[in-house]
């Protein structure tokens, strides 16, 4: 019988999500990878236990996480039932809908029919009465924004979600969505977007600035750029790397000599700071207080502990930030 560590709240700081009442741990656990049916279940349990024992209260899922789609929610539901159910009121569980989930015209994008049906399915797979956050997973160019936001409002009013979130939106669409949700009195509190030293899209498309101005939180996924911002690729591509074993999310063509040189230069900056490259990459995201939480993935429990160590130093000098920009190709005169 699992008993959570009595010291679990002594490790991590918790950040307020925008101006809401919701607090997120500075580091959250994402179940995008390593929780599908191709992964070892006992290892999944260890990952979740290690996370919670060290103050990671937030577990982030989506309907399509796997492989196969739905399997991450199903496996998390089993972990919840066997280990975490007594701690439900200490957990922040999120899921999403927006990508292809089932065949036909009603299993994708942002219609009211799809989002509300998907949420019901997600709750059933996880064995939950509600999720804490329900996200629309991506912008839908063909469905009226009012319909999609109305579905999020219905999810909250029905008690099946406590808060609404948006994922992969840009600044302009976020602002429009926020106005609709405010008018509907829906607690929209958070944006989830890809963000790393190598991917600064949210700085370029206005999302980061808009979220801060509107007092909404941000949680960053892929903070290590699918493993590029670790020591895994300092000497080229390892045979057991994700590139070799699962090329869906990180293509071998991305790892050029130029990219390897950037990784090595960033690693030297990290070493000078007394950090690993991964620690520095996570700290960089949290450097200015504008990102509420950083979403990590893990295949081993030790990786969770290593990532938490990034919080030991999230302060950067102007020279360090300039060096990181130069090394990663983002420096502007």
Residue ranges and their predicted role:
Residues 1-91, 157:
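N-terminal binding-site loop/beta-alpha segment at the start of enzyme catalytic domains
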Residues 2-11, 143-331:
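Beta/alpha (TIM)-barrel catalytic core signal, keyed to glycine-rich beta->alpha loops juxtaposed to Asp/Glu
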Residues 18-36, 94-107, 130, 135:
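N-terminal small/glycine-rich loop or linker at the start of catalytic domains
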Residues 29, 61, 95, 133-136, ...:
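Conserved beta-strand positions
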Residues 35-40, 64-72, 140-144, 171-172, ...:
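Acidic-and-aromatic substrate-binding clefts and catalytic sites of carbohydrate-active enzymes
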Residues 38-51, 110-126, 174-178:
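Short, acidic/polar
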Residues 39-43, 71, 75, 106-114, ...:
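Alpha-helix N-cap and loop-to-helix initiation/capping positions
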Residues 123-143:
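Active-site groove signature of glycoside hydrolases
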């Amino acid at each position: 019988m699992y008993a959570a560590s009595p010291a679990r709240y002594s490790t991590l700081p918790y950040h307020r999500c925008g101006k809401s009442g919701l607090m997120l741990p500075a580091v959250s656990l994402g179940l995008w990878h390593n929780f599908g049916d191709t992964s070892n279940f006992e290892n999944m349990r260890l990952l979740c236990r290690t996370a919670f024992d060290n103050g990671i209260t937030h577990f982030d899922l989506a309907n399509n996480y796997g492989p196969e789609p739905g399997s991450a929610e199903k496996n998390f539901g089993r972990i919840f039932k066997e280990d975490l159910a007594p701690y439900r009121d200490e957990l922040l569980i999120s899921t999403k809908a927006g990508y292809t989930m089932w065949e036909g015209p009603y299993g994708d994008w942002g219609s009211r029919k799809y989002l509300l049906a998907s949420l019901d399915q997600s709750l059933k797979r996880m064995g939950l009465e509600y999720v804490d956050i329900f996200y629309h997973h991506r912008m839908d160019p063909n469905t009226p924004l009012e319909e999609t936001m109305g579905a999020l409002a219905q999810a909250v009013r029905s008690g099946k979600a406590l808060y609404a979130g948006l994922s992969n939106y840009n600044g302009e669409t976020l602002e429009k969505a926020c106005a609709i949700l405010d008018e509907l009195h829906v607690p929209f509190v958070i944006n989830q977007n890809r963000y790393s030293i190598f991917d600064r899209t949210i700085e370029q498309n206005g999302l980061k600035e808009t979220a801060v101005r509107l007092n909404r939180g941000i949680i960053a996924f892929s903070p290590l750029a699918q493993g590029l911002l670790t020591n895994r690729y300092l000497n080229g591509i390892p045979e057991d790397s994700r590139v070799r074993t699962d090329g869906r999310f990180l293509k071998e063509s991305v790892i050029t000599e130029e990219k390897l040189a950037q990784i090595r230069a960033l690693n030297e900056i990290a070493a000078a700071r007394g950090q690993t490259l991964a620690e520095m990459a996570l700290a960089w995201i949290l450097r200015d207080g504008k990102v509420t939480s950083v979403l990590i993935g893990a295949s081993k429990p030790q990786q969770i502990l290593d990532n938490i160590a990034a919080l030991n130093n999230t302060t950067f000098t102007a020279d360090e930030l300039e060096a990181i920009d130069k090394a990663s190709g983002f420096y502007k005169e």
